[in-house]
Design a protein with these regions (language model features):
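Post-Walker A helix-loop "phosphate-sensing" segment adjacent to the P-loop in P-loop NTPases
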Residues: 118-126
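Short, basic/aromatic recognition patches
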Residues: 168
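Active-site nucleotide/adenylate-binding loops and adjacent lid/helix of ATP-dependent enzymes
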Residues: 161
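N-terminal beta1-alpha1 cap of cysteine-dependent amidohydrolase-like domains
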Residues: 1-109, 115-117, 130-158, 171, ...
Length: 234
């Protein structure tokens, strides 16, 4: 294997199997997308603390930071995928990526956590706005609505469109003011669909699931993410 390989750490998600055993997994759709890039190695990132991750949400500091930093230092980029709860483990990785300027893509819950971390009123934001009806919850493999791309954002330069169709599998939304992040996508009903952290190679969060569609716009997003990891021209 002569060519340089790049490691992308995917945050693992916890669930309980039929025997009520806590299992860690990664989203298969994300793994499959990354296998399309020959020089990318996806790995699963696991918590380094001795606790039930499924029940451990934001609030308690990470003790084994040196152990976690050891594996994060090996990664060239990160994906924080969808899930159910905000975790301090996820938050630590997002802060690490920002501090070290390593590319990171937040998807669905990962995006919502990014938004929460930089909200002006964190306690208020931790209870995300509950959407009424199912206007944002559908089949991950099909388009459900469109999002308007904000001009002069990193995302607008990536997709080169003012509006794109997206899938949607979320029942919560974010509509609060925040610090530091830049809004890059909004749906017609006012729901914020994407954000990005300025002055970094690639720190972008999206409410939709580009890994499930992997259409022309999703491919542009992942291509830009990978190029940022390789430090190639965008």
């Amino acid at each position: 294997m002569g060519e340089k390989m790049y490691i992308i750490g995917i945050v693992g998600r916890s669930y309980f199997n039929k025997d009520n055993q806590e299992i860690f997994q990664i989203h298969e759709s994300i793994r499959r997308v990354l296998t399309k890039y020959d020089d990318i190695l996806p790995i699963c990132l696991l918590p380094t603390e001795d606790y039930s991750y499924h029940n451990h949400i934001i609030g308690k500091d990470i003790v084994n930071k040196d152990k976690l930093d050891f594996i994060l230092d090996k990664c060239d980029g990160f994906i924080v995928p969808g899930g159910t709860y905000f975790h301090n483990f996820d938050e630590y990785i997002i802060n690490y990526a920002i501090k070290k300027d390593k590319p990171l893509l937040g998807i669905c819950l990962g995006y919502q956590l990014m938004f929460s971390m930089f909200a002006k009123n964190r306690n208020k934001f931790d209870m995300t706005l509950r959407l009424k009806g199912n206007s944002h919850y559908g089949n991950s493999k099909k388009y459900l609505h469109k999002v308007n791309i904000i001009e002069n954002t990193r995302l607008s330069k990536i997709v080169n469109k003012s509006c794109i169709p997206v899938n949607s599998v979320h029942k919560d939304a974010v509509m609060f003011d925040m610090n530091k992040l830049v809004i890059n996508a909004v749906s017609d009903d006012g729901v914020i669909e994407g954000v990005e952290y300025p002055k970094r190679k690639f720190i972008i969060g999206l409410e939709w699931h580009p890994e499930c569609l992997f259409d022309e716009y999703s491919k542009l997003i992942f291509d830009s993410f990978i190029k940022s990891i390789k430090k190639e021209p965008k």
